[in-house]
Amino acid sequence: MNGELSERARWAIVVAFAVAMAWVEAACVFYIRALVDRVEPYQVNPLPISAALGTVELWREAATLAMIVTIGLLAGRSWRRRIGYAAIAFGVWDVFYYVFLRVICGWPKTLFDWDILFLLPLPWWAPVLAPVSIALLMILWGTVASQGGEPARAPRWPWALGGVGVVLALAVFMVDASRALPHGREAVLRVLPTTFNWPLFSVSLLLMAFPALAEARRAAELTAGVRSRHTAENSGRWSPP
């Protein structure tokens, strides 16, 4: 990307890329689910995938993540902004993935429909609302991080809390598959969760929100400081002798 592009232009380009990528992702997932007669994933034997097709699907997921990281690296001019743009790309991609699936096949019908989010390292199960909530947080944090100034020194405690939140969310997503793991691969593929731990997920979401909230607060303070300096400079420049 050209160094002359403003951060707003870079943000718009990343969003456009993520939206287009979401359509490709939704189309691919629709093809696969139609092929195995699982357009709606929450049904008996939810992952009737052959070994060959399963391997291809795992590599497709890995390639998707590589594309998201790549657009972040290309868009950002510092590591902070690169991570921010990657977060924006992931969040926008995830939200529009569900929007386009709804357009293509009428699923999900509600935000509480169950979905298989990822297969790495185990199947992740959750209602659609859960990944969408995380995606919106990523868009918020990524936008503030990519559009704001570079901090002299950012506190680490919000990231520590956010990391704990990520671990908790992963545990909630993979708890059913992990319980079936001792019974072998077939048992893991046939898992069909019946309940979702919303209280624990809510705690994890709150913890994951700390980096975004801390970043937003820092950006607001930085903006207020810049305005104060400009006001002081203008007052000194135009004050009578």
Question: How should these model regions be labeled?
Answer:
Residues 48-70, 119-140, 195-201:
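Membrane-interface loop-to-helix entry segments
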Residues 31-38, 99-118, 179-189:
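Interfacial helix-loop-helix junctions of multi-pass membrane proteins
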Residues 71-79, 140-150, 210-218:
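Structural signal for the C-terminal ends of transmembrane alpha-helices
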Residues 36-53:
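Perimembrane loop-to-helix junctions flanking transmembrane segments
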Residues 18-35, 172-176:
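Alpha-helical transmembrane segments of multi-pass membrane proteins
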Residues 95-153:
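Membrane-proximal helix-loop-helix units in multi-pass membrane proteins
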Residues 6-18, 76-92, 152-164:
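Interfacial segments of alpha-helical transmembrane regions
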Residues 84, 91, 135, 142, ...:
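Small-residue hotspots
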